[in-house]
């Protein structure tokens, strides 16, 4: 690198430091003093279910006053308690109301009633990366790199706030109208200084240290980034099998095979992300995220332009206007039932 290029790199890294310091101030204000009860169920018209999960559903809703569409996550308090997800759910809301980044879905309102918790988020009409990836088969390397760059910046932001995301997968990445990513589902996100021990995540994306019940840190997110980049560029994940236990055996073995069409730069980056040895895994070394940002596979990436959303997206989802749900699957609709008695008031008092 010439002197001029090195100086430019240096000043960019300095301004990132300043940006993150300011971002942390903003985050901590909201983290220490979370917004509560900022809307009510009656203010929304429920339109259609966009997705379902073990303790709730996400629905497209329309804010009757403004006419704006949102995605409303509805969680059944009793089911959350039964599935021992109280802490995760409180984390999710507390984190979402405090973060602010171009590639994180925005929490617009949150509230609760006798039966449910509600998180009302920006509606991202392009649907999940998962469905586009399955339809197209695999993404070209430039296409995969465009998305990967956004995740790198997002993790750099989250990790600077001591947040681990822990649930990276194509199902949790929505594509917005400009073709950029919105990361959704902070159900497993956690504020951690040092290490944590919870077993959570999706089998194919789990880092070896989680499987081996070791204490782990934010390096698990960089491992998951390796899995995601591989899956985007190959069309299938690096470790897969019929049973989770077989997947886990492959993950901890430290062996990965690459499709012949992968470029040598891509293979090199993935070997450094899918690195079982934590002392060698990119993102976890003394240069932190810069080992990834300065890697040859990202040589053409203009990180600032990505952050400013100035780079032309490789793919814009088809979109027929506000409230269009054609990029989401259909689900059976169900009434939202609200009890006349309060359920689990104590457990969710801080929500």
Swiss-Prot record:
EC number from the UniProt entry: 2.7.11.11
UniProt keyword annotations, A-Z: ATP-binding, cAMP, Cell membrane, Cell projection, Cilium, Cytoplasm, Cytoplasmic vesicle, Flagellum, Kinase, Lipoprotein, Membrane, Mitochondrion, Myristate, Nucleotide-binding, Nucleus, Phosphoprotein, Serine/threonine-protein kinase, Transferase
Deamidated asparagine modified-residue sites: 3
Residues noted as binding ATP in the record, renumbered to the chain: 50-58, 73, 122-128, 169-172
Means of activity regulation: Allosterically activated by various compounds, including ATP. Activated by cAMP; the nucleotide acts as a dynamic and allosteric activator by coupling the two lobes of apo PKA, enhancing the enzyme dynamics synchronously and priming it for catalysis.
Gene Ontology biological process: cellular response to heat; negative regulation of TORC1 signaling
Reactions mediated catalytically: L-seryl-[protein] + ATP = O-phospho-L-seryl-[protein] + ADP + H(+); L-threonyl-[protein] + ATP = O-phospho-L-threonyl-[protein] + ADP + H(+)
Annotated membrane topology: Lipid-anchor
Positions where lipid (N-myristoyl glycine) attaches: 2
InterPro entries associated with the record: AGC-kinase_C, Kinase-like_dom_sf, Prot_kinase_dom, Protein_kinase_ATP_BS, Ser/Thr_kinase_AS, STKc_PKA
Residues annotated as domain Protein kinase: 44-298
UniProt modified residues of type Phosphotyrosine: 331
Keyword hit for DNA repair: no
Phosphothreonine, modified sites: 49, 196, 198
PTM characteristics: Autophosphorylated. Phosphorylation is enhanced by vitamin K(2). Phosphorylated on threonine and serine residues. Phosphorylation on Thr-198 is required for full activity. Phosphorylated at Tyr-331 by activated receptor tyrosine kinases EGFR and PDGFR; this increases catalytic efficiency. When myristoylated, Ser-11 is autophosphorylated probably in conjunction with deamidation of Asn-3.
Gene Ontology, cellular component aspect: acrosomal vesicle; cAMP-dependent protein kinase complex; cytoplasm; cytosol; mitochondrion; nucleus; perinuclear region of cytoplasm; plasma membrane
Domain AGC-kinase C-terminal positions: 299-351
Family: Belongs to the protein kinase superfamily. AGC Ser/Thr protein kinase family. cAMP subfamily.
Main function: Phosphorylates a large number of substrates in the cytoplasm and the nucleus. Phosphorylates CDC25B, ABL1, NFKB1, CLDN3, PSMC5/RPT6, PJA2, RYR2, RORA, SOX9 and VASP. Regulates the abundance of compartmentalized pools of its regulatory subunits through phosphorylation of PJA2 which binds and ubiquitinates these subunits, leading to their subsequent proteolysis. RORA is activated by phosphorylation. Required for glucose-mediated adipogenic differentiation increase and osteogenic differentiation inhibition from osteoblasts. Involved in chondrogenesis by mediating phosphorylation of SOX9.
UniProt subunit comment: A number of inactive tetrameric holoenzymes are produced by the combination of homo- or heterodimers of the different regulatory subunits associated with two catalytic subunits. cAMP causes the dissociation of the inactive holoenzyme into a dimer of regulatory subunits bound to four cAMP and two free monomeric catalytic subunits. The cAMP-dependent protein kinase catalytic subunit binds PJA2. Both isoforms 1 and 2 forms activate cAMP-sensitive PKAI and PKAII holoenzymes by interacting with regulatory subunit (R) of PKA, PRKAR1A/PKR1 and PRKAR2A/PKR2, respectively.
Full protein name: cAMP-dependent protein kinase catalytic subunit alpha
Organism name: Ovis aries
